[in-house]
Amino acid sequence: MSIDLSKLLTERRNANSANIDTLSTVDMLTVINQEDQQVAQAITPYLPQIAEVVDKVAAALRAGGRLIYIGAGTSGRLGILDASECPPTFGTRPEQVVGIIAGGHKAILSAVENVEDNKAQGAMDLQNLNFSNRDVLVGLAASGRTPYVIGAMEYAHSQNAFVAIVSCNPHGEMAQLADVAITPVVGPEVVTGSTRLKAGTAQKLVLNMISTGAMIRIGKVYSNLMVDVEATNAKLIERQVSIVMEATDCDRATAQNALDACGRHCKTAIVMVLADLSAAEAQSLLAKNNGYIRKALSNT
């Protein structure tokens, strides 16, 4: 089957970079930088759609469901990147936010031929995850037409699940299939068809919003502090102390003692200090308020 790439916005030539191979290095980079500046602005009109996805994901996570990203190539890698950052940043379990890439683990590091064209495999990869209507699927493809992702979307719909997409082609087949389509138009790439550039940047910005927004909604952030951060290295151990100090305006010794007493759980330590409670009392209060610090403090 032939594909008319000229119809895809992401495959058109960019007049602003037509002579980029003749420019000095600084001028070449200036063109790239100027093109990149369009990306954030292209996302702005889609904030209502992104908000809808955030709220759907938050509701799914509260109910025991999952956020599943699926894509091929750069798009798939971006989903995996966002998913992999959720456990250390927000203390989620690895299975709560999952990234799937066409071609599996090998495709993370190198290109795997033809896998993005396998529609049946997209559905099969969701089946292998026991995907259900409790989960949210976010399909990722710059072109908006990747068969692998479309297969996954169709399977998700067959399970009556909520399906969103992040693409840079508002007229692609994926946009027609999605419950919510987030399709910022970033224009042709500096290097024709190289969607790891502006399209990839746009997808990354949107994924940042989806995961971060959902985590804020389910209580993983207090003020602007990542209060469920896990202490998996020296930097994060120090960050925990800093977070408790910032949240409670206490001294270092008080923050350290509270963290030591509660098994290094920032939320518990914060409630201990602010409400003058023991570790057990703070843990119980947080549990009664679904892990939301503000709700817990208002009910002391």
UniProtKB/Swiss-Prot annotation:
Matches recorded under InterPro entries: Etherase_MurQ, Glucokinase_regulatory_CS, MURQ/GCKR, Reg_chr_condens, SIS_dom, SIS_dom_sf
Domain of life, per UniProt, equals Bacteria
Q: What is its EC number?
A: 4.2.1.126
Name of one Pfam family that matches: GKRP_SIS_N
Q: Which Gene3D superfamilies match?
A: 1.10.8.1080, Glucose-6-phosphate isomerase like protein, domain 1 (3.40.50.10490)
Enzyme class per UniProt? lyase
Another remark in the UniProt entry says:
A lyase-type mechanism (elimination/hydration) is suggested for the cleavage of the lactyl ether bond of MurNAc 6-phosphate, with the formation of an alpha,beta-unsaturated aldehyde intermediate with (E)-stereochemistry, followed by the syn addition of water to give product.
Task: Describe its function.
Answer: Specifically catalyzes the cleavage of the D-lactyl ether substituent of MurNAc 6-phosphate, producing GlcNAc 6-phosphate and D-lactate. Together with AnmK, is also required for the utilization of anhydro-N-acetylmuramic acid (anhMurNAc) either imported from the medium or derived from its own cell wall murein, and thus plays a role in cell wall recycling.
**Subunit structure comment from the entry:** Homodimer.
What is this protein identified as?
A: N-acetylmuramic acid 6-phosphate etherase
